[in-house]
A protein has these predicted regions:
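Beta-propeller-forming repeat regions
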Residues: 21-374
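Sec-dependent N-terminal signal peptides of Gram-positive bacterial secreted proteins and lipoproteins
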Residues: 2-27
Length: 374
């Protein structure tokens, strides 16, 4: 009987392993199978092979709206979409030169060909954005790279390179594509970035955040465009929370109905989560944390509780956790933290203070939320 139970248990374990898709002794690369290419993507891939050879490995942005190795956008001044492709020519190295960015276009017969190819600015792709800036219709490509090593010694004046002495985890490059040529216009280190109209002037800016992983104070920069030049806006600085070790989430939203705001979720050294809220007021960049009378308790909460737009009104709510009735005295009792239940008080910033929007129960583990009636 014992042997039969043992065999049954072993069989059940084997079935569960098969169903989970996990196999002992395999690495994560074997578990990540790229999606099957569409017919059009297959034509693009074949055109890429003619230029780059067959030993290529497609890469894709790790965050943001665009998560494909093949991104179709019209990035020049001619009709029709181009295709931006990210790939590596040697998958066994972190050498930045092994990462390539290729723009493919169609000829007069409708066949794809590689129009231009450049080396990437890092070891892998972190984020991809497209935007026009100022009163100009030209669409620019913003590529964020993971960087293994920061080297600021090769600044090229022609590329308007701007580098920070601190060592962030990523670096963005702004590219233009005109007359079949990619030009690298600007470069800046960052931890997180967001393309948005933060100063409410009707035009997009790039907001970059550098956290304090290297021991420096966290900072924010605003990249603007004028007269054909990208530059960091001078004087647009604000004191960031120096207790934040790293920022892990960035969102754009509003305060009220029309004031743009940037919401940054950061992690402190003790693992707790905090939110930095930045916005323009009276022509200067402001932090809600520094507003007079703002309660500090809104800033700190358990790890993993991120700000979000819970009611789809474009105003980001910031969570504040409160123990449910019956758990108030749990610290004096033998109750594990994982067994405690909390209500989430979702707060918004309005009229210079955080105000309660609604109360809900939010279960992060099972990803569900229900509101508590008033």
């Amino acid at each position: 009987m014992v042997n039969r139970k043992w065999l049954l248990g072993l069989l059940l374990f084997a079935v569960l392993v098969q169903l989970s898709g996990c196999y002992p002794g395999t690495g994560t690369d074997n578990l990540l199978v790229p999606p099957k290419l569409t017919a059009e993507q297959d034509k693009i891939y074949q055109a890429l092979e003619k230029t780059a050879g067959s030993n290529i490995n497609l890469r894709y942005p790790q965050t943001g709206e665009y998560r494909s190795s093949f991104v179709l956008r019209n990035i020049d001044d001619e009709p029709g979409d181009e295709t931006i492709v990210f790939y590596k020519t040697n998958v066994n190295t972190t050498n930045p030169t092994s990462l390539k960015v290729s723009v493919l276009d169609k000829d007069d017969l409708g066949n794809w060909y590689c129009a231009y190819d450049i080396s990437g600015g890092g070891s892998d792709i972190h984020q991809l954005e497209f935007s026009s800036f100022g009163a100009f219709d030209q669409l620019f490509m913003i590529v964020g790279y993971n960087q293994a090593i920061v080297d600021t010694s090769n600044n090229n004046a022609d590329s308007q390179l701007t580098a920070s002495p601190r060592q962030a985890s990523n670096v963005l490059h702004i590219y233009s594509y005109r007359s079949g040529e990619i030009k690298d216009l600007f470069s800046q280190e960052y931890s997180l970035m967001k393309v948005m109209d933060i100063d409410n002037d009707g035009y997009q800016e790039i907001v970059t955040i550098v956290d304090s992983k290297t021991g420096d104070e966290p900072s924010v920069n605003i990249i603007e465009y004028n007269a054909g030049i990208f530059y960091i806006s001078q004087g647009e600085t604000v004191a960031m929370d120096d207790s934040v070790l790293s920022y892990v989430n960035v969102q754009s939203g509003f305060i009220g109905t029309n004031q743009s705001a940037l919401y940054l979720d950061g992690v402190r050294e003790d693992g707790s989560t905090t939110t930095e809220l930045l916005f323009y007021q009276n022509g200067t960049l402001q932090s809600a944390r520094l507003e007079k009378g703002v309660v500090d308790s809104i800033d700190t909460r358990k790890a993993g509780n991120m700000s979000m737009d819970v009611d789809s009104d474009d105003v980001i709510e910031i969570p504040e956790l409160h123990l449910m009735p019956g758990y108030e005295w749990s610290e004096y009792m033998d109750v594990q933290e994982s067994d405690k239940l909390y209500f989430t008080h979702w707060k918004i910033f309005s009229n210079g203070a955080f105000q309660l929007k609604k109360i809900s129960y939010f279960n992060m583990g099972f990803n569900y939320l229900f509101d508590i009636p008033d």
